[in-house]
């Protein structure tokens, strides 16, 4: 588990950008899913291709929860809209998502798929804009709050078992 910092891309090498793999000691791992360059938070890095395939397969609807800060105040009707599934890019129906308000500009969003820039596009479809996006949990495991940006640690046996149990691997 890594607390991905802003400004890094989810790749092993890139000529133009810093890569998260530069931050870890081992180079035999790869990112399980992606967070865009400006998104921070929980990034799973593994050397188990089978695990990666299962966690990313659309069949499993792996849960991902994000802390979101928006440009405009949040509207309460968005809770129902997210529960029904937002249409992004004028034609792509997202699976239902859970939106939980913190205050007028901050919320948590839980999604069960991983379309390209999905949460940002969901808010754009609702005439709002994401100004900060931070993944707080992945596959039922919460980001270790003691990890500073750029730091990582191995999953505990309990965390790994929780993922396996939740998604029947």
Predicted regions and their residues:
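RNA pseudouridine synthases
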Residues: 1-169
């Amino acid at each position: 588990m890594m607390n991905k910092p802003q400004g890094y891309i989810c790749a092993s090498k890139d000529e133009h950008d810093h890569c998260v793999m530069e931050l870890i000691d081992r180079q035999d791992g790869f990112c399980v899913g992606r967070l865009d360059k400006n998104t921070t938070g929980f990034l799973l890095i593994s050397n188990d291709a089978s695990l990666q395939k299962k966690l990313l397969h659309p069949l499993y609807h792996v849960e991902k929860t994000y802390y979101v800060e928006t440009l405009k105040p949040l509207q309460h009707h968005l809770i129902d809209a997210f529960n029904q599934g937002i249409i992004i890019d004028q034609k792509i129906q997202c699976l239902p998502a859970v939106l939980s308000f913190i205050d007028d500009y901050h919320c948590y969003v839980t999604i069960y798929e991983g379309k390209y820039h999905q949460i940002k596009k969901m808010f754009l479809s609702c005439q709002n804009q994401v100004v900060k996006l931070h993944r707080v949990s992945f596959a039922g495991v919460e980001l270790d709050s003691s990890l500073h940006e750029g730091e990582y640690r191995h999953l505990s046996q309990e965390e790994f078992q929780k993922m396996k149990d939740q998604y029947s691997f």
